[in-house]
Amino acid sequence: MAPKAAKGAKPEPAPAPPPPGAKPEEDKKDGKEPSDKPQKAVQDHKEPSDKPQKAVQPKHEVGTRRGCRRYRWELKDSNKEFWLLGHAEIKIRSLGCLIAAMILLSSLTVHPILRLIITMEISFFSFFILLYSFAIHRYIPFILWPISDLFNDLIACAFLVGAVVFAVRSRRSMNLHYLLAVILIGAAGVFAFIDVCLQRNHFRGKKAKKHMLVPPPGKEKGPQQGKGPEPAKPPEPGKPPGPAKGKK
């Protein structure tokens, strides 16, 4: 048993508590003394940056692109579709055949209807080539351009075949330039028919969108400017009951 403390002796002072920022002795490693500075709490989330982040745009859709960014995407997508599906090559070949036929017939005396048909078809083929090359049709959505192109090819094929038949029947003897011009007109008609077949393959497996030609609903008309809402009318006061009629 420990000896009892003598009477009148002062008790031993308790050890001083460690400072609040100091680490306990158990956490000391490699003889390093604990720092007096408290550690900062680790932030779980990063601070938001002041720079606005750009939204990721889809590759196969126009998304929210505007201005020049939208036109660049439309131009690239339109030319990709126009050249990969074979429409550009067919239309350019048809246009080349018609221009060559016009040059060959320029030095001969032919019926004016042949010149008219060739000039008309050159104009239509040039129009559609420029339309698809510069993506103009993407900004005119109220016209069904694939259907218009399909009808243009059908009409061009019919007109060019008719021009060949008319050119053969209108002359009994044909020189070399005239014969070459007739062959080129027929080749342009064949290319137009091939373009019709390509248009049909393009339409396969596609469904028309519902309500595509339905106009958007009109906006509800708000209150007229300068006129506030009409104040509510106060309720009419009740009429006092009439005097009771006495009996005679």
From Swiss-Prot:
Disulfide bonds: none annotated. Residues 1-63, 208-248 are annotated as: Disordered. InterPro entries: Marvel, MARVEL-CKLF_proteins. One of its GO terms (cellular component) is membrane. One of its GO terms (biological process) is chemotaxis. It is found in: Membrane. GO terms for molecular function: cytokine activity. The keyword Calcium does not apply. The chain crosses the membrane at residues 116-136, 147-167, 178-198. Highly expressed in testis. It comes from the Eukaryota. Residues 82-204 form the MARVEL domain. Residues 23-63 have a biased composition (Basic and acidic residues). Belongs to the chemokine-like factor family. This is CKLF-like MARVEL transmembrane domain-containing protein 2.
